[in-house]
């Protein structure tokens, strides 16, 4: 017995003497239901849980299930037994860890879990605990679980999150969290906000992004319908005086609303970088946006019947891009006159899809007199092919008429354009015609790179004696 006690004492001493970093690494490798049990081995381990600055509580299956199931709701409306068991284990683990917490600050809380109706108050209490401990980074991924044809649980983000004076970085992805910010004093130190939404249920999208006085980076992604109720249209309002970088990636569920498209208004006087991606074009409005340097626009779904709508609303979207130096744009169709003048544009990436509206390239060349670098990339899109059906192969692929030469050579070709990259071309007649035109008229062109095999048709054509022609 004596030797056994002595051995246990030696083990306890060794555990107590382990460096903090090594303890952290050991615990990170253990399954959570075993990790918390380490508190019985040594006071040092218990103290570790009471003061560890970074807390990661992640249900391992959540990301995979969420990625597979785009509706975020189990198809059967039922839990798998192993998921339910793991979920309960996680609840106990998180509650146990936070119940041991001493007065030390929490630097980061990462909480990725499911949420049933009976879990709402518990999850909210964990968030409030993090706020009380001066959390700096908060990462929430909360997935509601509920039966088909039932209303899911609603978790209102605690008011203390909005008023937290230490929170700098906030990420939230949820199909059940709602946002009701106070009228003043919100997010006094928040610099980065990443919100992933699914079918916002109220007018919170008008409020959440307009109460961040020092916000510099904002990302809004997710799936939306056009309306939040039968009488209220969905609106996103971004008003942030210090915002420098904005990402909007929203996709529309056409099953949930057939009224006018949702709207997005942006007031950001210091905005420098904007990245926009939609499968339908919302109604955009901009105010005090005059500092853009870099922009990206991707309207990624094409329907022929949608062309007039896009052309009608595209000018409002593109108007603040007049000042950019770097632009990437991927659209299926824009009528002539939709583009502003790009007097400061130096680098352009133009993604052409299978509907091949080459007039857009012509207009860009004409409206970008100082363009120095051009990337043209063809991207296959089966939706275009399906929309055109048999006319696609007869009228699009094998016709030189898809490209119309400009009436006069654009200024950028004769004076500034030094680099051209062509990607994804298949060697169709209109593609060869475009490449030949650029090569023939690029008077100051230094390098043209073609990622394709139709090099034999271009080898002997150069408008600039200094141009290096490269095929890869």
Name these PLM-found stretches.
Residues 2-231, 235-237, 412, ...:
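Leucine-rich repeat
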Residues 2-4, 452-472:
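C-terminal helix/juxtamembrane-tail motif
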């Amino acid at each position: 017995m004596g030797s056994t006690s002595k051995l246990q004492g030696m083990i306890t001493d060794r555990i107590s003497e382990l460096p903090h970093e090594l303890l952290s690494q050991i615990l990170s490798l253990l399954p959570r239901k075993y990790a918390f049990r380490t508190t019985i081995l040594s006071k040092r381990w218990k103290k570790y849980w009471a003061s560890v600055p970074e807390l990661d509580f992640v249900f391992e299956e959540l990301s995979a299930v969420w990625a597979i199931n785009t509706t975020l709701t189990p198809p059967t409306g039922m839990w798998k037994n192993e998921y339910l068991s793991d979920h309960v284990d996680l609840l106990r683990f998180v509650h146990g860890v936070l119940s041991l917490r001493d007065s030390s600050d929490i630097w980061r809380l990462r909480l990725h879990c499911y949420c049933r109706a009976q879990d709402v108050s518990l999850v909210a209490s964990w968030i409030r605990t993090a706020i009380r401990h001066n959390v700096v980074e908060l990462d929430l991924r909360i997935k509601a679980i509920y039966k088909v044809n039932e209303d899911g649980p609603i978790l209102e983000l605690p008011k203390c999150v909005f008023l937290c004076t230490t929170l700098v970085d906030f990420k939230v992805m949820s199909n059940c969290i709602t946002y009701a910010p106070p009228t003043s004093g919100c997010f006094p130190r928040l610099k980065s906000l990443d919100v992933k939404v699914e079918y916002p249920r109220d007018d919170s999208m008008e409020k959440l992004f307009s109460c961040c006085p020092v916000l510099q980076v904002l990302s809004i992604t997710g799936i939306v319908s056009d309306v939040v109720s039968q009488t209220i249209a969905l609106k996103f309002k971004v008003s942030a005086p210090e915002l420098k970088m904005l990402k909007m990636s929203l996709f529309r569920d056409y099953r949930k609303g057939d009224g006018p498209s949702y709207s997005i208004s942006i007031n950001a006087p210091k905005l420098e970088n904007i990245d926009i991606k939609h499968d339908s074009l919302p109604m955009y409005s901009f105010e005090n946006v005059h500092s853009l340097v870099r922009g990206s626009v991707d309207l990624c779904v094409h329907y022929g019947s949608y062309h007039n709508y896009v052309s009608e609303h595209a000018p409002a979207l593109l108007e603040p891009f007049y000042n950019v130096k770097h632009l990437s744009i991927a659209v299926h169709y824009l009528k002539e006159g939709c583009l502003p003048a790009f007097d400061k544009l130096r680098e352009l990436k133009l993604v052409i899809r299978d509907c091949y509206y080459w007039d857009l390239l012509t207009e860009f060349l004409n409206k970008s007199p100082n363009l120095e670098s051009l990337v043209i990339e063809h991207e296959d899109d089966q939706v275009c092919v399906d929309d055109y059906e048999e006319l696609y192969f007869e009228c699009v692929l094998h016709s030189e008429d898809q490209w119309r030469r400009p009436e006069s050579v654009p200024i950028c070709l004769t004076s500034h354009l030094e680099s051209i990259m062509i990607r994804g071309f298949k060697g169709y007649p209109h593609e060869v015609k475009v490449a030949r035109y650029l090569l023939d008229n690029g008077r100051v062109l230094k390098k043209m790179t073609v990622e394709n095999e139709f090099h034999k048709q271009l080898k002997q054509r150069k408008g600039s004696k200094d141009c290096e022609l490269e095929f890869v």
